[in-house]
């Protein structure tokens, strides 16, 4: 029988804190990693992004690959977030164990630090 547990994002928000997206298009911020080699463990990731700045920002999520992996670029999701707006940007994107460091990363299309903050949680599903 499968078990379900809710956890904070890891590695970025282990205490439930928000994760500020830093730098720009060439540097990714790790949002969540599925650090298991067990292929019966799935991470269902829920993320909300808030723009605390005064201008719109394009948030780019890279879903499902390792650091700088081509697979993640193929699964790129773009969101335009207006000032003082919060968007639900990951409605349960699911990543699976089987290789370590399968993750979700984020970056901004513009060079503005910490004006977009991500909060969220992970439902860990163990089917073993």
How would you label these PLM feature ranges?
Residues 60-64, 119-121:
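Beta-strand signatures of extracellular beta-sandwich domains
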Residues 50-54:
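Short solvent-exposed strand-capping/beta-turn motif centered on an Asx-Ser/Thr pair
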Residues 63-67, 108-110:
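Short acidic, glycine-rich loop/turn motifs
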Residues 1-40, 108-128:
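C-terminal interaction-tip segments
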Residues 39-46, 99-101:
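Short, solvent-exposed loop/turn segments enriched in Ser/Thr/Gly
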Residues 66-103:
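Intrinsically disordered, low-complexity Pro/Gly/Ser/Thr-rich segments with frequent PxxP/GP/PP motifs
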